[in-house]
């Protein structure tokens, strides 16, 4: 991601998206209520029947929208941002408009920038990003494709083999199955991890290597869902491969919190967190990416910094973040047990 311009007084940063990882960072930086300004396209409404029968012409317009929803689409290197138009052509004001962001898109992000958003932006605009991996968890019936980002796991979609079940086809072959997987992943230029039960994983690994894909790990698992990815991340081979990634750190700190909870030195909930922060008794504050944007989240982060508490922001796009979200989005590990 490239920073083209900024106006700190207005909270406006002009960015250019350069690769898929930038889209992941952007998804984590922006939130509902922020404003995005970019060029998008609208269709010209034609009046005559003959004109309506033709494909409508699309013209570029520049709009600013107030963000309501942000989403990736399966197997597409695009981020779709939806919201109401606050600035643009007069007939678009107040209407819903989507802005599609992909490689080479330039856009303005206008928001109240807290320290964590700024830190994430700084990391995104550094020349070298943390490693990203493509993971395929498969058996003989289906293959689930994931991207392991520094901040979590993104499921891209599912490819069915057609061997059995509702997607069964009489023309099934292993080669056609592997070719369908290759066709789905060829747009991604990341090192590949292949995971799953049985022999399908070994067959796919050999198939991809013959076609010059970089397969960096093959691992056994009884699962083909996102849980298989976490099994790999927690394994010794997985730790060696992605030990520096955010997802690995999320696993480590959440596991430490759950252990501390069993020992009586773990706490959760915003009020409990606030109480022990004010006492200076909290060693680690764990907060989800959903909560760190909230007013309460910003207050607790500021308090944690003032007393020297270590801060960990975990992504709700992975299981570890979802665990903390079930504890209210806020969790902590005490420096010492406090007498009540």
From Swiss-Prot:
Q: Which UniProt keywords apply?
A: Cytoplasm, Endonuclease, Hydrolase, Metal-binding, Nuclease
Question: Where, per UniProt, does this protein localize?
Answer: Cytoplasm
Q: Which InterPro entries does UniProt cross-reference here?
A: eFR1_2_sf, eRF1_1_Pelota, eRF1_3, Pelota/DOM34_N, Pelota_arc, Ribosomal_eL30-like_sf, Transl-rel_pelota
Q: Which GO terms describe its biological process?
A: nonfunctional rRNA decay; nuclear-transcribed mRNA catabolic process, no-go decay; nuclear-transcribed mRNA catabolic process, non-stop decay; ribosome disassembly; RNA surveillance
Signal sequence, start to end = none
The Swiss-Prot or TrEMBL record describes its family as follows:
Belongs to the eukaryotic release factor 1 family. Pelota subfamily.
Descriptive protein name: Protein pelota homolog
Q: Which organism is it from?
A: Thermoplasma volcanium (strain ATCC 51530 / DSM 4299 / JCM 9571 / NBRC 15438 / GSS1)
Task: Point out the gene that encodes the protein.
Answer: pelA
